[in-house]
Amino acid sequence: MKKINKENFKKTLSTFTTGITVVATNNNSILYGKTINSFSSLSLSPPLVLFSLDKKSSKLKIFKESKAVSINILSYKQQIISNNFAKKNPNWKEINYDVLNNGNPIIKNCISNLDCK
């Protein structure tokens, strides 16, 4: 089997159209968010979703230790938000959001939002 070129593989996979979400949480009164496209429904009964983070992600430990997260399903008009949370240190000051009772941020004007445990 041929060795796969990482850049060609990435370019090929980028042609697959998928939804974009921002997964967010609150850890010790600090808000964290990450752009995620590896989001999927897992089950309707019980209602379960899943998302994946790279093992090398600086936010992996934070999300693993979180008891709850918000999942914000972005529209095609929210590329600026997607790009913001794709950065290592996103700027929450640029984002229009509310805070849920559990402390997690929920981004306003998304297609949909989920509050997940």
List where the protein language model places each region.
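Active-site-proximal mixed secondary-structure blocks
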Residues: 1-117
